[in-house]
A protein has these predicted regions:
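Short, conserved catalytic/metal-binding motifs centered on acidic residues
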Residues: 28, 91, 210-211, 225, ...
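Short, basic alpha-helical/linker "hinge" immediately adjacent to a nucleic-acid-recognition surface
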Residues: 39, 44-45, 49-93, 118, ...
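Short, solvent-exposed helix-loop connector elements
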Residues: 43, 192-198, 463-470, 486-502, ...
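Dynamic "connector" segments at or just before major functional cores
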Residues: 93, 136-311, 318-338, 345-350, ...
């Protein structure tokens, strides 16, 4: 017997009892085709049944069986990036230092591990880093707007003018144009009257001013305050070295109650009356609801009709009142539910009586603002109202029975094709749930398919004046559209009504501020909307210079700078929350 060569010593079981799937298939097929074994014999040797061997042979003959990996080009396998993986940790570390993708690529080349800018950007995207926003430092960004890294911004605190730089550049210098009117309204006194809480570090007025700055700069959400942290003008506006961070600003509303907002609005309305931003003598108000839609499925929120979606959706219902004399908002409330929404008209009457000492003279509202029973309560208080009546089947039969001789044509003092409507008046009409009778006007020719039915308890007002007054009610919808566009009122700040309550009150304050600012710009801006004022004036860049007790804001030259030069701006204002320093404006 021939002795086995030492070179052949090994493990024959690796061939006779293969463990890898493809190797076992190969040996079974070889036994069938080369050694001439039957299906059953080849299968028994390598652990297959007879039918499994038949299928294996069939797939092999059909070319469907891949037993060996196809040859590939030399180098790393497709889909792998060993160079990127090797420097991934270093790329992350350099990004946390505030370097851009170009700077990271240059730094890696200097360290002997080169990687192009595109690969660096891909690593940053994979790791969740956003776009790098540059701060004032030449090399490293201090902006917290870059996700995945810590911020170097200091904690919020009252501004220390002793350490404040003598001169600073800012992109928000125009925001400080609103400060003189804040002083006129005496915001610190309003805050104290409302009882807003402060903290050990930040006074209550600065908390409110910080949130107000977000409204005036059209910052959509409180969580977007990061966009303003590096700008000195927004912090100076609130009397702080740096604005509070988003967590602190969000948590502040949780410390408040509805009573805080009501006391603040009462004090604000008194100041608005004194400044001519609201009228106490006429006391005619437009009332309306507005549903702020929630883009989620929070079961706690009730469903209300959302006009922008033409359907009912989960939302926070808010209520607003507008002074018809000045077209300024004077009241807002977000602490409303379906069970209480019908009594909002009564709640506003109570509010205005606390402000002026008497009930409103007249309320103008849509038919869904309140019920007939509440209209009876308003009549008992001596409050006049004008609203629409729902067109029931019986009312439509009554309207259809009228002939052309039953109508009287009147002329309205307004331009357009619908200034000569036809009116049929019923002096005493009974309603289902109203305790007395009301005056009813059936109006056609206003551009609507169906007649408009107006009801009122005012027997003295002339027909022409009543129709004109109700037609002007639509301006409150314009006010709501303005605060949505300018102050992001439709960006729901929370699913908790009390938190939204503070948000809508800040919208009323911001609208009053820009209304006061608008009056200083001259008659050409009498109807300018808040977003126009923000875009043309408040978004102006400039320089802040500190000289002793005087802070001078130099506004950069823009297309509308001549308007500011000729306006009635306060040129020298003492600011209480700046430790009584003076604010001056000048133009470059």
């Amino acid at each position: 017997m021939t002795a086995r060569s030492a070179q052949r010593e090994g493990k024959p079981g690796w061939f006779t009892s293969p463990q890898q799937v493809n190797q076992r298939r190969y040996e079974a097929l070889r036994a069938y085709f080369v050694d001439g074994l039957s299906y059953a014999e080849a299968g028994a040797r390598f652990g297959y049944t007879r039918w499994a061997m038949i299928n294996l042979v069939r797939e092999h003959r059909a070319g469907k069986l891949e037993l060996f990996a196809p040859p590939r080009r030399p180098g790393p396998a497709p889909g792998t990036a060993p160079a990127r993986d090797r420097v991934r940790g270093r790329v992350i570390a350099l990004r946390r230092q505030g370097l851009s993708s170009y700077e990271i690529s240059a730094r890696l080349s200097a360290e002997g591990t080169p990687l192009n800018r595109t690969s660096v950007a891909e690593i940053l995207t994979e790791e969740g880093f956003g776009r790098l926003l540059r701060g004032p430092a030449p090399e490293a960004s201090i902006s917290p707007a870059t996700p995945g890294r810590d911020t170097n911004m200091p904690a919020a605190a009252v501004i220390d003018f002793g350490t404040w730089p003598q001169q600073l550049d800012t992109t928000r210098a125009g925001l400080l144009l609103a400060i003189p009117d804040l002083v006129t309204l005496d915001l610190p006194a309003l805050t104290a009257t409302a009882g807003y809480p402060g903290t050990r570090v930040i006074p209550a007025a600065s908390w409110l001013l910080s949130l107000l700055a977000l409204k005036l700069t059209r910052t959509r959400r409180v969580s977007h305050v990061d966009d303003l942290l590096a700008d000195p003008a927004t912090a100076l506006f609130a009397g702080l070295a740096v604005l509070p961070k988003k967590t602190a600003l969000t948590d502040y509303s949780y410390r408040l109650s509805h009573d805080h907002q009501q006391r603040f609005l009462a004090a604000l309305d008194k100041k608005m009356i004194g400044a001519g931003l609201a009228t106490a003598q006429e006391a005619v108000f437009d009332l309306d609801f507005h549903a702020i839609m929630h883009w989620g499925q929070d079961p706690v929120l009730e469903k209300h009709y959302v006009p922008s979606r033409s359907q009912r959706a989960r939302s926070v219902l808010t209520f607003f009142a507008q002074d018809t004399g000045t077209h300024n908002l004077v009241y807002a409330n977000a602490d409303i539910s379906k069970a209480t929404q019908n009594r909002e008209a009564i709640a506003f009457c109570d509010h205005w009586k606390a402000v002026s000492g008497s009930d409103p003279k007249m309320l103008i509202m849509d038919q869904k603002v309140t019920t007939q029973a509440i209209l009876g309560e308003l009549d008992a208080r001596g409050v006049k109202f004008a609203t629409l009546r729902m067109r029931s089947a019986s009312l439509m039969n009554r309207i259809n029975s009228l002939t052309s001789t039953d109508y009287k044509t009147i002329t309205l003092d307004r331009p357009g094709p619908y200034n000569r409507p036809r009116v049929h008046e019923d002096p005493a009409v009974t309603l289902t749930s109203y305790p007395g009778t009301v005056r009813q006007l059936i109006v056609t020719g206003l551009g609507r398919d169906a007649p408009t039915v107006i009801i009122t308890n005012d027997d003295q007002i002339k027909t022409r004046a009543l129709i004109s007054q109700y037609a002007r009610r639509m301006t409150i919808e314009q006010r709501l559209a303005e605060i949505i566009g300018a102050f992001c009122a439709d960006a729901l700040s929370s699913t908790v009504n009390l938190n939204v309550d503070l948000d809508v009150v800040l919208c009323v304050l911001a609208q009053a501020l820009l209304a006061a600012f608008r009056t200083r710009l001259g008659p050409g801006y009498a109807t300018a909307t808040p977003d126009t004022l923000q875009r043309r004036f408040l978004d102006t860049a400039g320089t802040i210079t500190t000289d002793g007790d005087t802070i001078t804001v130099t506004l950069s030259r823009r297309a509308y700078s001549p308007v500011l030069r000729q306006s009635d701006l306060h040129t020298d204002t003492t600011i209480p929350w700046w430790q009584n320093r003076r604010l001056r404006f000048q133009f470059s």
